[in-house]
Amino acid sequence: ELPGEVDVVSDLGTGGGIPGISIGITTNITVNLIDVKEKRIFELSRLIKILNNNNVFAIQDDAYNHIKKGGFFVSRCFISSEKVINSLKTDKNTTYLVSSNGEDLDYDSNLFHVKHENFKINKDDIRHIDVINVK
């Protein structure tokens, strides 16, 4: 569940639209699927039209341009947690949910709050997500 004050979620380096499409289907939040590749955006636009989903948008752009603007971001494979911390501007309205490898991060705890979440996808596989907030 996303915090009530989130109006727009940007799925950076979306690829096939995961997790952005799922967020768009299950919420009324505006979801921007951002990817630099024209073919991906074309296919995602077709999928959005088939789903008749009016709160999800496919945008062809460099995801790093959006990181610099701040906001609420999700990413499955686009960027590592370490690169997120190095790329984020210190905007207190920035939150980033990113899949990770579960390793400890080297970051300035005065600037960032990082919460590591682990979850099982079956009895043997664990996945990791880092929730990174600018303080």
Say what each PLM segment does.
Residues 1-5, 65-67:
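Glycine-rich helix-loop-beta junction characteristic of Rossmann-like nucleotide cofactor-binding loops
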Residues 5-15:
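Conserved class I S-adenosyl-L-methionine
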Residues 13-16, 77-79:
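N-terminal glycine-rich "phosphate-gripper" loop used for MgATP/nucleotide binding
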Residues 22, 32, 36-135:
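S-adenosylmethionine
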Residues 16-28:
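Conserved SAM-binding loop of SAM-dependent methyltransferases across substrates and taxa
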